[in-house]
Amino acid sequence: MTVPATRKDLMIVNMGPHHPSMHGVLRLIVTLDGEDVIDCEPILGYLHRGMEKIAENRTIIQYLPYVTRWDYLATMFTEAITVNAPEELGNIQIPKRASYIRVIMLELSRIASHLLWLGPFMADIGAQTPFFYISRERELLYDLFEAVTGMRMMHNYFRIGGVAADLPHGWIDKCLDFCDYSLTGVAEYQKLITRNPIFLERVEGVGIIGGEEAINWGLSGPMLRASGIQWDLRKVDHYECYDELDWEVQWQKEGDSLARYLVRIGEMTESIKIIQQALEGIPGGPYENLEVRRFDRARDSEWNYFEYRFISKKPSPTFELSKQELYVRVEAPKGELGIFLIGDNSVFPWRWKIRSPGFINLQILPQLVKRMKLADIMTILGSIDIIMGEVDR
């Protein structure tokens, strides 16, 4: 930490790692001159579990339950990126219905993540009521997830070549009802929060990031779009079936905490529009590419002249990851979630590098909080939207 040696009466304060506003186990060492922040040093690693190393000793299917523990509030995105990488390496085709189901699940997960960002963010800056409001919608969302995947969180639903199960009978109608209800809920949030003078006083002009600065820091997601850069990987990379649906990229040009709030609120509305279109246009057909289930190599499967693979239960696919390098990415709620994968003609990846958006977006925090007030740290940190599971991995 760089503290000017000439300054006297500076106070060094630890915020976290068990402060309720730290959104996990983040620790900030803050140097204060009265109420003014002179310096801030984030200390990471309290939730490090060696996720990248674990991946090197697991097949893709064996590794799927682990990835839901990165960003545990938006687990569909970590699953999507985990299956997209081997799909591209193996040139595996996805059935149209599976692609639509994936988009529906991804956007529902985006809404869930933004809801659980909004409640604690408002609580951080002194507004308790919205936290109870978002719990209402979130419970309905988790009921939808539970009906399809069997789990309210940590869904383990995506598979290489499709999804684990089809949508149950009557689920589409329930989801359409949820979309109609959510639109009124988002309008309620805007009426309750957006024009609130106390809220505006806390967020307007706080934590400003310019467009060029955001690009130089490698920011992504709402952090980047709130600074006037219209960059959304759903439009840029054309993955899944997003091109077949009508929706707009949400962005603001002010670059402050209010702009980041407005981008996320707008994204919730756009996600509802995407889900409604996908539900109405979802095609029939298979939900999984069953060709993936075959073994690539049937040799050496005998033991005492007995084919053990025929009596085993639904085996995990053991196709090899070819010897090449690949970077795949999706637009997660917090930004660009990517994986750099190196295959080595083995069932295990040789290298599995995770590019988590929260880790990169967090790097700009010390610069944003300098010369601000102590109370503004909560506002700025909350507007970045971090989950320590994906920051520390």
Swiss-Prot record:
<comment type="function">
    <text>NDH shuttles electrons from NAD(P)H:plastoquinone, via FMN and iron-sulfur (Fe-S) centers, to quinones in the photosynthetic chain and possibly in a chloroplast respiratory chain. The immediate electron acceptor for the enzyme in this species is believed to be plastoquinone. Couples the redox reaction to proton translocation, and thus conserves the redox energy in a proton gradient.</text>
</comment>
<dbReference type="InterPro" id="IPR014029">
    <property type="entry name" value="NADH_UbQ_OxRdtase_49kDa_CS"/>
</dbReference>
<protein>
    <recommendedName>
        <fullName>NAD(P)H-quinone oxidoreductase subunit H, chloroplastic</fullName>
        <ecNumber>7.1.1.-</ecNumber>
    </recommendedName>
</protein>
<keyword id="KW-0618">Plastoquinone</keyword>
<keyword id="KW-0874">Quinone</keyword>
<keyword id="KW-1278">Translocase</keyword>
<dbReference type="Pfam" id="PF00346">
    <property type="entry name" value="Complex1_49kDa"/>
</dbReference>
<dbReference type="InterPro" id="IPR029014">
    <property type="entry name" value="NiFe-Hase_large"/>
</dbReference>
<comment type="subunit">
    <text>NDH is composed of at least 16 different subunits, 5 of which are encoded in the nucleus.</text>
</comment>
<keyword id="KW-0934">Plastid</keyword>
<dbReference type="InterPro" id="IPR001135">
    <property type="entry name" value="NADH_Q_OxRdtase_suD"/>
</dbReference>
<dbReference type="GO" id="GO:0051287">
    <property type="term" value="F:NAD binding"/>
</dbReference>
<dbReference type="GO" id="GO:0016655">
    <property type="term" value="F:oxidoreductase activity, acting on NAD(P)H, quinone or similar compound as acceptor"/>
</dbReference>
<keyword id="KW-0520">NAD</keyword>
<keyword id="KW-0521">NADP</keyword>
<comment type="similarity">
    <text>Belongs to the complex I 49 kDa subunit family.</text>
</comment>
<keyword id="KW-0793">Thylakoid</keyword>
<dbReference type="GO" id="GO:0009535">
    <property type="term" value="C:chloroplast thylakoid membrane"/>
</dbReference>
<dbReference type="GO" id="GO:0019684">
    <property type="term" value="P:photosynthesis, light reaction"/>
</dbReference>
<dbReference type="GO" id="GO:0048038">
    <property type="term" value="F:quinone binding"/>
</dbReference>
<keyword id="KW-0150">Chloroplast</keyword>
<dbReference type="InterPro" id="IPR022885">
    <property type="entry name" value="NDH1_su_D/H"/>
</dbReference>
<keyword id="KW-0813">Transport</keyword>
<keyword id="KW-0472">Membrane</keyword>
